[in-house]
Swiss-Prot record:
GO terms for molecular function: rRNA binding; structural constituent of ribosome. It comes from Brucella anthropi (strain ATCC 49188 / DSM 6882 / CCUG 24695 / JCM 21032 / LMG 3331 / NBRC 15819 / NCTC 12168 / Alc 37). Belongs to the universal ribosomal protein uL6 family. HAMAP family: Ribosomal_uL6_B (MF_01365_B). Keywords: Ribonucleoprotein, Ribosomal protein, RNA-binding, rRNA-binding. GO terms for biological process: cytoplasmic translation. Part of the 50S ribosomal subunit. This is Large ribosomal subunit protein uL6.
Length: 177
């Protein structure tokens, strides 16, 4: 079983953190985030680090212990540096473009797919076959990237579709005569 929860989360330079009951708040160069820790986990600030402990030794408390520590670590990294996910588009005629605040995707459908980018997330299209999703909330960045990928996930025969940068697509062999 993982013991990641035992390790206190150091507050990085340039980030101010506060613990108010079960709410951990972090403020940095990129913005401000807060996380509400579950009641089964005790949170305290000591010596420039946030430490978490389970209130009892139940399975639920111990599982939320490590998750809470990781979530607190993620909000510190988010307000300091931010998070980024890159997507690649492959396929003939498949491309992306920004149209105001919306992302317009041509993915082989009879219509253009228009994705409304949520607040707090920035989407950039450096090339027509590349999409870069950035933001301070790791969960939201991953969710937006997954929603964009879901429109046309990579298929196993030719590899066409939207995939994460560096993602390995398991290819299949086609029919044989």
């Amino acid at each position: 079983m993982s013991r990641i929860g035992k390790k206190p989360v150091p507050v990085p330079a340039g980030v101010t953190a506060s613990v108010d009951g079960q709410i951990v708040k972090a403020k940095g160069a990129k913005g401000e985030l807060s996380f509400v820790v579950h009641d089964e986990v005790l949170v305290k600030m000591e010596d420039g680090a946030v430490s978490v402990d389970p209130r009892d030794q139940s399975k639920e408390a111990r599982s939320k212990w490590g998750m809470s520590r990781t979530m607190i670590s993620n909000i510190f990294v988010g307000v300091k540096d931010g998070f980024e996910k890159k997507l690649e588009i492959s396929g003939v005629g498949y491309r992306a473009a920004m149209q105001g605040k919306n992302l317009q995707l041509s993915l082989g459908f009879s219509h253009e797919v228009v994705y409304d980018v949520p607040a707090g997330i920035t989407v950039a299209v450096p090339k027509p076959t590349e999409i870069v999703v950035t933001g301070i909330d790791k969960q939201q960045v991953g969710q937006v990237a997954a929603e964009i990928r879901e429109y046309r996930g990579p298929e196993p025969y030719k590899g066409k579709g939207v995939k994460y940068a560096g993602e390995k697509i398991v290819r299949k062999e086609g029919k044989k005569k």
